[in-house]
Design a protein with these regions (language model features):
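N-terminal ligand-binding lobe of clamshell/alpha-beta domains
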Residues: 1-276
Length: 276
């Protein structure tokens, strides 16, 4: 979001997950995951469950690196402690830093709240006009998609945020499906993602299944989808693995790209193919 607001040069450090735009990867990392790399979905779920049941953190903050950066503002989130360092951990460390930075936590549950966070963050960073402009551009793109698919048949779309165990996409994802011209029979707009069974997914009679394992890129999502290909094929639906990390998991301006991607999957005859 900071880069989209034109503040890239002011970004002193990022998390280990920050990979867009490419220059974000060049900044020092101040977090790391304690979950080993290379695990499949079931192994990740098991590792997360074991650590959280023991009250152990899933991420670590590099407070020594933070201390040397002399930052004025720390941007964090409290939407999901499985996805990033907890807000409480960030706040505690911020209070101990010599620069005494302000901390802003972005915690949206809906697409509207994501867009509202753009001017909120921009104001905190001293560029309010950039935030208003970016939010207006995002809203205009969403309205354009909504107009393009208005009146078209709405396929039943199930978004799988995880495949082992199954999680149904929540928060802003059901709204993204609706804006793109689909009907989400299982997602609950503005609510957290939730577990489900294959039987529940089958009973929803989806026309389309979008496989968007949280935090995984397109290649990883395709590999995870292939692991469950037999079960997915039994649904009789079109199955599309997507780049969740880029377009669905992270509450930022690229969610608009995600809506455009969904609209192209659901109604390719009505919307231009999105540019990636």
């Amino acid at each position: 979001m900071l880069f989209a607001l034109g503040l890239g040069e002011a970004v002193a450090a990022v998390t280990h997950e920050c990979d867009y735009p490419p220059e974000a990867r060049e900044r020092p990392h101040v977090t790391r995951s304690v979950i080993p790399e290379g695990l499949d979905a079931a192994e990740i779920d098991r590792a997360v469950g074991e650590r959280t049941s023991r009250g152990e953190a899933l991420y670590e903050l590099d407070d020594s690196t933070l201390s040397g950066l002399d930052v004025d503002l720390i941007v964090t989130q409290a939407v999901c402690e499985v996805c990033a360092v907890s807000y409480d951990d960030v706040r505690v460390i911020a209070e101990e830093l010599p620069s005494q930075p302000s901390v802003i936590s972005l915690d949206p549950s809906t697409l509207g709240e994501v867009l509202a966070d753009l001017p909120r963050l921009a104001a905190a960073a001293g560029v309010p006009e950039a935030g208003e402009r970016l939010a207006a551009q995002a809203a205009e793109r969403l309205e354009r998609i909504e107009r393009a698919v208005a009146g078209a048949p709405r396929p039943r779309v199930v978004a799988l945020e995880w495949l082992d165990p199954i999680y149904i996409g929540g928060h802003w994802v059901p709204q993204m499906i609706e804006l793109a011209g689909g009907e989400d029979p299982l997602g609950r707009p503005g609510e957290r993602s939730r577990t489900a069974s294959w039987e529940e997914v089958e009973a929803a009679r989806p026309d389309v299944v979008v496989s968007m394992p949280c935090g995984l890129d397109a290649e990883q999502a395709a590999a995870e989808t292939d692991r469950h290909r037999d079960r997915l094929e039994r649904l009789g639906a079109r199955v599309h693995p997507v780049d969740a990390a880029a377009y669905f998991s992270r509450p930022g301006p690229r969610l608009v790209d995600g809506v455009e991607l969904l609209a192209d999957l659901l109604h390719p005859e009505l919307v231009p193919e999105p540019v990636r």
